[in-house]
């Protein structure tokens, strides 16, 4: 396993993060506690030290499963990231959003489910139009100062919103975001227009989610919805098939055959090879696929390979935070 620093901090993380959205019971393709344990333990064996979850994943089940397993190890070995924003209780109007009240109560709940005293990376899951960003940043800064959170991150939003948040942090003297978790893969590169340059300029580490397009770049074009998870992603209307998406898929397939590897490994290696990317978030329900993901880091993609893979891309609809 390769390791890197998180954003412009000194914290060391593995070059892949295990995404834990698949833990729980919200959808039929998800993993129960026993299956989740097997995946987490194998990730640890492979050298993965970075785990990403969220309070809304199966309404807290994901955090609980992750916390139960990591609680049996030396906590200091791992970097645990979770998120806040989504509604957790429809009877409680303050269980979602990014108000001070919501952040304080949901942070406490996440710490309890994870069985931890401190969260390494606390991320805002989306932008909250209903709450002044200064209120959100003040609450997050308080969490850092109280020792409940070590670092702050953001996820899927417009670049102008992220820039406003960074500026407000500097103006008010608040702890600033060090990471951006956004939708980014070979078939969806709209982030390169504004978000990627912003992150590069500000020293923000990117943690791309869906680096293989929830399977779109892991199987031939005609088999896009061949799995239950693939059908779920197709139903969300991701624009992977738009623009040059079909040709990109076919080129990933061709290069994978040429190199004797899996399509998903080519797609993942492309993402991991971007300088602005610290660690792609690998979400999988299979130990075999997890092992493939780790092996993907050793694949050699030449400059000409990268140029050839990228060439068919055309602008598509903005997705991930619409």
Features from the language model and the residues they span:
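Beta/alpha (TIM)-barrel catalytic core signal, keyed to glycine-rich beta->alpha loops juxtaposed to Asp/Glu
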Residues: 128-311
């Amino acid at each position: 396993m390769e390791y890197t620093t998180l954003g412009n901090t000194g914290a060391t993380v593995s070059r892949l993060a295990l995404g834990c959205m698949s833990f729980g019971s919200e959808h039929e393709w998800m993993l129960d506690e026993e299956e989740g344990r097997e995946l987490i333990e194998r990730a640890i064996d492979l050298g993965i030290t970075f785990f990403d979850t969220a309070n809304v994943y199966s309404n807290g089940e994901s955090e609980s499963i992750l916390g139960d397993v990591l609680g049996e190890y030396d906590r200091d070995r791992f970097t645990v990231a979770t998120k806040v924003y989504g509604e957790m209780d429809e009877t409680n109007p303050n269980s979602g959003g990014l108000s001070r009240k919501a952040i304080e109560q949901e942070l406490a709940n996440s710490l309890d489910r994870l069985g931890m005293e401190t969260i390494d990376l606390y991320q805002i899951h989306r932008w909250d139009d209903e709450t002044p960003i200064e209120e959100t940043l003040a609450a997050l800064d308080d969490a850092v100062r109280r020792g409940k959170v070590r670092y702050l991150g953001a996820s899927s939003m417009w670049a102008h919103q992220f820039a406003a948040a960074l500026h407000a942090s500097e103006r008010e003297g608040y702890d600033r975001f060090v990471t951006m978790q956004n939708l980014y893969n070979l078939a969806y590169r709209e982030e390169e227009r504004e978000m990627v340059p912003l992150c590069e300029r500000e020293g923000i580490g990117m943690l791309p989610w869906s680096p293989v397009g929830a399977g779109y770049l892991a199987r031939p074009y005609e088999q896009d919805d061949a799995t239950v998870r693939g059908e779920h992603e197709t139903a969300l209307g991701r624009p992977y098939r738009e623009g040059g998406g079909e040709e990109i898929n076919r080129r990933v397939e061709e290069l994978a055959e040429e190199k004797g590897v899996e399509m998903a490994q080519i797609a993942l290696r492309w993402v991991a090879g971007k300088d602005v990317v610290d660690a792609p978030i690998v979400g999988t329900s299979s130990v075999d696929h997890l092992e493939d993901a780790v092996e993907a880091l050793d694949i050699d993609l030449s400059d000409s390979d990268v140029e050839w893979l990228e060439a068919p891309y055309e602008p598509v609809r903005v997705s991930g935070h619409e």
